[in-house]
């Protein structure tokens, strides 16, 4: 595809989203952004490749939503408010219908989550989407993976396992009921970045991250960064009732512990902040479950309903 055809893309991406602080956005060599005093800039980037992170024939609107949301999840994990993002788009061909659907979905989500596209790049090649998100957090208030202490309580938002279960959508040998298929499709392409929850946890959580690589792996990151371990209560893991009916208990446990792609927040809470977190949960301000505690020993121990440590095979995150 001749590269000059990419001039058509300006029509679709020149005005996506609105946010304060954009002094100069799409159309120049770079964006000029105003960072308010007393705020830190949080920056994260993820790349999605067709055939690796989503099916090559996925609908463009689905791709757009997934690409932006998985990036925004990183901002949520740091307690940041989304402001701006850039887009690097590699396309195998200039399909105007594809671009229209992709840009409309991207614009809708940018509006929903309060961020603006401020720049990017386009080129020809295999379908690849790279999005860099930028957000703001008050100085000294960012949530990070470092800071957990022995005895801290481990929590996770929402429910787990649905992101990994969604891979069944792309297995032709698996038959799924229509309602289940729609739930899994929504979970895969439209994960909800826990931005509101991230803001609520500022000043209360000692460490946090989003569950993208699997609960065991991601909780392991918190433990490693703090030179600690954790005891994980298997019976406390939050699983949607409908998901439990989708496969045998062992498979569901594998989805929950190792599957990844859930984009929930895993966070630790010191004992002195536990009452505040419990109050938010009881009051409906936060949907989260206590699933264990940090320990002075290294490694993650999985504890069954009888209080016994059990060996759990960690299969690890699987790409599409």
How would you describe each model-predicted region?
Residues 1-59, 78, 83, 87:
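Extreme N-terminal cap/leader segments of soluble proteins
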Residues 29, 152, 262-265:
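Short, surface-exposed beta-edge/turn micro-motifs
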Residues 42-45, 143-199:
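Short, acidic (Asp/Glu-rich) active-site segment that either coordinates a divalent metal cofactor
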Residues 63-75, 105-106:
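Short, well-ordered amphipathic alpha-helical segments that serve as non-catalytic structural scaffolds
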Residues 75-84, 114-124:
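Short, flexible active-site-proximal loops enriched in glycine and acidic residues
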């Amino acid at each position: 595809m001749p590269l000059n055809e990419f001039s058509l893309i300006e029509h679709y991406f020149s005005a996506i989203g609105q946010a304060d602080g954009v002094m100069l956005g799409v159309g120049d060599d770079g964006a000029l952004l105003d960072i308010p005093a007393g705020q830190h800039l949080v920056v994260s980037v993820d790349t999605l490749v067709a055939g690796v992170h989503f099916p090559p024939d996925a609908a463009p609107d689905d791709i757009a939503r997934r690409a932006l949301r998985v990036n925004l999840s990183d901002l949520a994990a740091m307690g940041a408010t989304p402001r701006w993002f850039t887009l690097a788009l590699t396309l195998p061909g200039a399909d105007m219908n594809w671009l229209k659907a992709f840009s409309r979905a991207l614009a809708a989500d940018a509006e929903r989550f309060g961020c603006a596209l401020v720049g990017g790049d386009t080129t020809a090649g295999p379908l690849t989407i790279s999005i860099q998100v930028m957000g703001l957090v008050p100085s000294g208030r960012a949530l990070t993976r470092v800071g957990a202490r022995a005895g801290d309580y481990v929590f996770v938002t929402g429910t787990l396992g649905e992101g990994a279960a969604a891979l069944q959508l792309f297995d032709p040998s698996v038959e799924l009921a229509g309602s289940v298929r729609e739930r899994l499709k929504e979970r895969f392409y439209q994960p909800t970045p826990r931005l509101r929850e991230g803001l609520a946890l500022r000043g209360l959580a000692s460490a946090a991250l989003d569950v993208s690589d699997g609960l065991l792996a991601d909780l392991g990151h918190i433990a490693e960064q703090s030179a600690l371990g954790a005891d994980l209560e298997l019976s406390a893991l939050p699983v949607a009732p409908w998901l439990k009916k989708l496969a045998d208990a062992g498979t569901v446990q594998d989805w929950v512990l190792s599957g990844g792609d859930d984009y929930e927040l895993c966070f630790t809470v010191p004992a002195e902040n536990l009452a505040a977190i419990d109050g938010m949960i009881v009051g409906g301000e936060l949907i989260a479950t206590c699933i264990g505690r940090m320990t002075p020993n290294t490694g993650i121990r999985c504890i069954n309903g009888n209080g016994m440590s059990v060996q759990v095979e960690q299969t690890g995150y699987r790409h599409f």
